């Protein structure tokens, strides 16, 4: 597959990792649609004619408007879909409640699932597509001290429908990537946190990943370089 005129949708495109993924695809001459909730300025600074921005607040999606919004905003054909949405509410297991759990799972997993459901049908018709859901190494540890809801939502996100086996016959592949501790705004604020210092000791390289490093793994999993792997969860966490 040649990258010319190929289209990718990146959910959570204004995140630190998302920005790097956007830049990597633009450098390969892909048409990039980047979804964002906040941080529009970071995306606009890229100033590229091949970059289109879509604003959507997943918190405002409900049973009445979800299908309508998805049809309006996410109805185009895409060759690749990458979900980097990552809402964190800083809730511990002890302090969580039904409302906060539902909110986090809806934003990080349920709405992205429904968007994927819409887009995968068009991928099947064109007989080519790549879907990658970006999860967290926190799933492995039952979530962090103050990120229980986030970890739970990412655990839900890793649930791949068994239809992926049929999709492979149409060259549509779907995978998850568990991302480890990365030098993003959230972890920068936690730098002095004792829990984070302990986690860095568990990583052989004794450091956080760079967003650019994570982006390279993400990009490779949705290019035609990956012509075989599907239904898998790949961990990129530096050995933690």
Model-derived segments and spans:
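Short C-terminal tail/terminal secondary-structure segment
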Residues: 230-240
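Conserved NAD(P)H cofactor-binding loop of Rossmann-fold oxidoreductase domains
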Residues: 84-90, 239
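Substrate-binding pocket helix/loop in short-chain dehydrogenase/reductase
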Residues: 92-93, 100-105, 199
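Short, small/polar-rich loop/turn modules that mediate ligand/substrate recognition or access, typified
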Residues: 171-173, 229-231
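N-terminal Rossmann NAD(P)H-binding glycine-rich loop of SDR-like oxidoreductase domains
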Residues: 14, 22
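Catalytic loop of short-chain dehydrogenase/reductase
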Residues: 130-156, 161-168, 181
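A conserved structural motif in NAD(P)-dependent oxidoreductases
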Residues: 203-214
